[in-house]
């Protein structure tokens, strides 16, 4: 009698409409229930309802009330957590194909079918790319996926590389070449092959894109300064704007440097052979003449030329550093001219380091961590590598060359691709001011610092540099690490703007055109100005792609490293391995620390820090944890930790602090 009763249907609709409706994101737990996190409140989701949703789904829900208890009932899908995703193949007990999503918070198997384009026979544990086809909240059907690509087999030792590249939709292959290569601009080059250029790089480097030559400037037999000549490989000599290689480089934007190997932006026969500044081979180059006084000030406008150059020696960072540091049994240069170049470059570098410490910003020394891999991809060891004097020689030469390129492009071309950084995010300037005052001000200097660190002052390049110089001598990294969270991101722009991170008025990279697309663009602009040819301002879509590619490459490198750290540390749990570490992040859930010996990131759950979670408070302004009202841990603290658990499946490394 009540079937199809319009009054009853209307009543049901009214009851439904009267219920509170919310939007939020689903958070799963390791139990069958979950939660819906909304802007101001979190609601319980019961186990039957959790079967309709997945961790990370953005949904609409109605709130059901029973007494003083509230729970969310999922109603509609706004945005699914999964569209394209990485997974492992699984067969259930009925031999039905399923996929297990590669995500630490999603553990339900999803039924799947193989796309016709995937010809391989899939096996348990294989890594695949899949797409979610049906979702219970959207399609009134259970979760179901299509497998579109086999990434690699379950037992592939290089899975961390292939899976991560697939996740970020990056190619594992170099760009295809286009033999034969013809030089497009031969006529306008000067012959500089007589100059004694040298390259300084890692021993294994093949894609050498910079060579250096230096000589003193003298007046009346007294040295007054330096003339540095920076020669940079010229791949645009071989690459036409309308070529396939150009289009691929424009999409990739960077050579991808991964643990163990790289994936070049250009075909290897260009990056490692034709364009690489190989010793005793004549190569096309874009060359910049730079003049400074003895204290490192630039004293003349930079002078650019297209040229042919010939590196006279391929030198290695460690050997040159050993030689300059006069280490026992150190390598010795083969030619006196090479020795002379090394010593002059060393003197120039010391002057430029001092100049940057005074006039711009100089970075605190932090090591790079290098994975030493066996043939099969197994991690043999992880080395902390510090920048030594030979690395600094190249770094200072490249920095001054990029300062000069920014000046040249701004004045001559009125455009370019500039590396910019505007310091503190405008919305955090007040926070930065308050934080500096809370940590550095006292009764004596209160008035002076209030002006020195005023919001207006911190927003200027000079004010920002002044503040950084003030905190530089402080031994702890706490101030620097906390202030870093208030900074904005670096950006590529087509007009000159300051780079607060470097403390410079302008910066435009052109010294790595084999490895960076932005540098290729700047090469073309510089060469167009020199040849008095027309040129175009770099398009916004190119700048946006550079930004996105840089972000992607960093994620790829980090994800592979996290996986390799798990493999490396897994067998060290049983031995209760202990490490010195620095606190990198402070959250309600616990601490994230970095192991100083190898760079691995470790999570310390709050439950291991104190047995009563009600007595643990997070101070988000200080990035500090308070226990029983006392500040106990803050970002930048040095702690001793031990490993307690490594899970390769979720790439998580867990530890605890040794009191």
UniProtKB/Swiss-Prot annotation:
Subcellular location field: Cytoplasm
**What are the RNB domain coordinates in residue numbering?**
189-531
Keywords, A to Z, come to: Cytoplasm, Exonuclease, Hydrolase, Nuclease, RNA-binding
MF (Gene Ontology)? exoribonuclease II activity; RNA binding
Q: Where is the signal peptide?
A: none
Gene Ontology CC terms = cytosol
Per the UniProt entry, what is one GO biological process?
Answer: mRNA catabolic process
Task: Look up the EC number in the record and give it.
Answer: 3.1.13.1
Cross-referenced SUPFAM superfamilies? Nucleic acid-binding proteins (SSF50249)
For this protein, the record's Pfam families field holds: OB_RNB, RNB, S1
Catalysed reaction per UniProt? Exonucleolytic cleavage in the 3'- to 5'-direction to yield nucleoside 5'-phosphates
Domain (S1 motif) ranges: 576-658
Q: Which PANTHER family does this UniProt record tie to the protein?
A: EXORIBONUCLEASE 2, RIBONUCLEASE
Similarity comment text for this entry: Belongs to the RNR ribonuclease family. RNase II subfamily.
Its job: Involved in mRNA degradation. Hydrolyzes single-stranded polyribonucleotides processively in the 3' to 5' direction.
NCBIfam families, alphabetically? 3_prime_RNase, PRK05054.1, RNase_B
Q: What is this protein called?
A: Exoribonuclease 2
- What is the protein's species of origin? Haemophilus influenzae (strain ATCC 51907 / DSM 11121 / KW20 / Rd)
């Amino acid at each position: 009698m009540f079937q199809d009763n319009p009054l009853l249907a209307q009543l049901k609709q009214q009851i439904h409409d009267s219920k509170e409706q919310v939007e939020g994101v689903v958070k799963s737990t390791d139990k069958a229930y979950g939660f819906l996190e909304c802007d101001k409140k979190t609601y319980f989701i019961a186990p039957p309802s959790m079967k309709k949703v997945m961790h990370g789904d953005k949904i609409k829900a109605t709130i059901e009330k029973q007494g003083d208890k509230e729970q969310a009932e999922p109603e509609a899908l706004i945005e699914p957590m999964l569209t394209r995703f990485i997974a492992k193949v699984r067969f259930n007990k009925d031999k039905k194909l399923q996929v297990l999503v590669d995500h630490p918070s999603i553990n339900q198997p999803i039924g799947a079918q193989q796309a016709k384009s995937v010809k391989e026979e899939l096996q348990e544990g294989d890594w695949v790319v899949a797409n979610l086809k049906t979702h219970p909240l959207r399609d009134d059907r259970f979760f179901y996926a299509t497998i579109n690509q086999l990434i690699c087999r379950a037992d592939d030792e290089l899975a961390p590389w292939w899976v991560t590249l697939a996740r970020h939709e990056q190619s594992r292959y170099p760009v295809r070449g286009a033999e034969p290569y013809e030089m497009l601009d031969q006529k306008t080059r000067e012959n500089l092959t007589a100059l004694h250029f040298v390259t300084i790089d890692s021993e294994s480097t093949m894609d050498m894109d910079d060579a250096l030559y230096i000589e003193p400037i003298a007046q009346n037999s007294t040295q007054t300064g330096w003339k540095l000549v920076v020669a940079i490989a010229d791949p645009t000599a071989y690459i036409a704007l309308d070529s396939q290689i150009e289009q691929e480089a424009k999409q990739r934007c960077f050579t991808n440097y991964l643990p163990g190997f790289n994936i070049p932006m250009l075909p290897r026969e260009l990056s490692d052979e034709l364009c690489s500044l190989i010793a005793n081979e004549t190569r096309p180059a874009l060359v910049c003449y730079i003049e400074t006084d003895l204290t490192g000030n630039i004293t003349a406008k930079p002078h650019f030329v297209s040229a042919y150059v010939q590196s006279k020696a391929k030198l290695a960072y460690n050997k040159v550093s050993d030689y300059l540091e006069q280490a026992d049994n150190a390598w010795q240069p083969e030619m006196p001219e090479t020795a002379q170049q090394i010593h002059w470059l060393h003197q120039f570098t010391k002057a430029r380091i001092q100049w940057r410490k005074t006039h711009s910003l100089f970075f605190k020394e932090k090591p790079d961590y290098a994975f030493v891999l066996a043939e099969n991809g197994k991690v043999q060891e992880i080395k902390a590598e510090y920048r030594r004097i030979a690395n600094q020689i190249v770094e200072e030469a490249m920095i001054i060359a990029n300062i000069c390129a920014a000046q040249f492009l701004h004045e001559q071309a009125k455009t370019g691709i500039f590396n910019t950084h505007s310091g503190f995010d405008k919305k955090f300037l007040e926070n930065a001011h308050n934080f500096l005052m809370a940590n550095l001000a006292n009764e004596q200097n209160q008035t002076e610092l209030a002006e020195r660190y005023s919001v207006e002052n911190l927003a200027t390049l000079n004010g920002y540099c002044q503040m950084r110089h003030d905190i530089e001598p402080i031994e702890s990294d706490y101030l620097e690490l906390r202030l870093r969270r208030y900074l904005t991101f670096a950006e590529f722009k087509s007009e000159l703007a300051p780079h607060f991170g470097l403390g410079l008025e302008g910066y435009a990279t052109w010294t790595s055109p084999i490895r960076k697309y932005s540098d290729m663009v700047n090469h073309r602009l510089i060469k167009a100005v020199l040849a008095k040819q027309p040129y175009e301002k770099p398009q916004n879509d190119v700048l946006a792609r550079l930004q996105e590619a840089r972000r992607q490459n960093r994620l790829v490198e980090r994800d592979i490293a996290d996986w390799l750290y798990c493999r490396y540390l897994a067998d060290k749990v049983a031995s209760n391995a202990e490490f010195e570490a620095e606190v990198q992040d402070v959250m309600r859930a616990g601490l994230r620390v970095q192991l100083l010996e190898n760079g691995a990131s470790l999570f310390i759950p709050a439950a291991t820090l104190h047995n009563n979670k009600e007595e643990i408070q997070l101070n988000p302004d200080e990035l500090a944890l308070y226990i029983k009202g006392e500040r106990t841990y803050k970002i930048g603290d040095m702690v001793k930790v031990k490993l307690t658990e490594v899970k390769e499946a979720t790439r998580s490394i867990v530890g605890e602090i040794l009191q």
